[in-house]
A protein has these predicted regions:
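Sec/Tat signal peptide C-region and signal peptidase I cleavage site
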Residues: 6-10
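Amphipathic alpha-helical repeat scaffolds of TPR domains
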Residues: 12-23, 44-65, 90-110, 135-151, ...
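Terminal, low-structured helical/coil segments at or just beyond the last alpha-helical repeat
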Residues: 176-187, 191-238
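Bacterial N-terminal signal peptides
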Residues: 1-5
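Surface-exposed, polar helix/loop patches in the mature regions of secreted/periplasmic/lumenal proteins
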Residues: 78-131, 200, 206, 216, ...
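Helix-turn-helix repeat elements of alpha-solenoid scaffolds
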Residues: 24-40, 69-82, 115-123, 154-165
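Structural marker of alpha-solenoid helical repeat scaffolds
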Residues: 45, 88-89, 132, 170-174, ...
Length: 238
């Protein structure tokens, strides 16, 4: 009976987590009240710090994409605290992975000094996740993003693409992983002025989360320039 109850509880979290994820990623139509309701629903079934960190990360993502850096940073900080607590007591790929993801995104909503101090730590935590699970798609994505979206002197499209290619061909990706990979392929194609290739990747991404703000921007062949307040003149874009 206990095992059945635990299994059902885990399934309830998985379902609630997927629902929160879908609402957050379809942020063109998502309302804050819907996100918070889905967040609170998922929180009822959280059974460990990694799960808590995961839903905090999604809430941070929603507020970041709605230009509320203060709330985004608050949720990202909470995600970092929970995932750190988890990997310090029970090192797992999932704990290191969500820590790397939250740290990476937190760098975009905090000060430039925070980015400089913490941005270079992202690959270390992603690599720790991959050491425990070589097929951890989220950790590989964090590594790829470090090369693709980072300001100079860390930007290297060629290196980032190699990581994406290796992962998408060898790992099992969840829906959000696939969306992120497709969107990033499109971003790189636009950076390389290959709009036809970008559109192919965007069509794939649109099949997953059609109402995503970043997707809509990329579909207009527009994209954010990351690290604008940091010198990017020496970016290694290959």
């Amino acid at each position: 009976m206990v095992l059945v109850a635990v299994g059902a509880f885990a399934q309830d979290f998985a379902s609630a987590y997927e629902n929160l994820k879908s609402i957050v990623y379809n942020d063109v139509v998502a309302k804050e009240s819907e996100v918070l309701a889905a967040y609170n629903d998922a929180a009822k079934f959280v059974s460990n710090d990694v799960e808590g960190a995961q839903i905090d990360y999604l809430a941070g993502l929603f507020y970041m994409n709605n230009n509320d850096k203060a709330k985004a940073g608050s949720y990202y900080n909470s995600s970092l605290a929970k995932s750190k607590k988890s990997y310090e007591t029970n090192p797992t790929a999932e704990a290191y992975c969500i820590y790397a993801e939250a740290l990476s995104q937190n760098c975009t909503v905090q000060s430039s000094s925070y980015m400089v101090s913490n941005g270079t730590k992202v690959p270390n935590f992603a690599k720790k996740a991959l050491a425990l699970d070589p097929k951890c798609a989220g950790a590989s994505y964090s590594l790829a993003c470090y090369s693709i979206y980072a300001p100079a002197p860390f930007c290297n499209l060629k290196k980032g693409l190699k990581i994406l290619d290796e992962t998408i061909n060898t790992s099992k990706l969840d829906t959000d992983d696939l969306f992120n990979y497709y969107s990033t392929y499109a971003y790189v194609a636009l950076k390389q002025k290959n709009t036809s290739l970008a559109d192919e990747w965007l069509a794939k991404a649109a099949e997953i989360y059609p109402n995503n703000k970043n997707l809509k921007m990329l579909q207009k062949h527009e994209f954010k320039t990351y690290g604008e307040d940091i010198d990017t003149s020496a970016a290694n874009v290959e």
